[in-house]
Amino acid sequence: MKNIKNSPKLQLKSTGTPFQGTVDYKNIALLRKYISTEGKILPRRITGLTAKQQRAVAKAIKNARMVGLLPFINLEGY
């Protein structure tokens, strides 16, 4: 059986120090760090955020999508 933790698919994404303060849906540069190339929100185990921070980031990403600042999906590769 493979060791899941050493799998190359689950390598942690280094985002440096997690953000300080509040998350805003207008801060697109920050939110793009927590979105995959396909446009999906990255999970906590990859981003290294706390549960509270992850909920705030997810909510901000969803708000930015509804306003039109972020795409729902990335169609560049298709």
From Swiss-Prot:
Keywords: Chloroplast, Plastid, Ribonucleoprotein, Ribosomal protein, RNA-binding, rRNA-binding. It is found in: Plastid, Chloroplast. GO terms for cellular component: chloroplast; mitochondrial small ribosomal subunit. One of its GO terms (biological process) is translation. The keyword Cytoplasm does not apply. GO terms for molecular function: small ribosomal subunit rRNA binding; structural constituent of ribosome. InterPro entries: Ribosomal_bS18 (IPR001648), Ribosomal_bS18_sf (IPR036870). NCBIfam families: S18. Part of the 30S ribosomal subunit. Belongs to the bacterial ribosomal protein bS18 family. This is Small ribosomal subunit protein bS18c. It comes from Oltmannsiellopsis viridis (Marine flagellate).
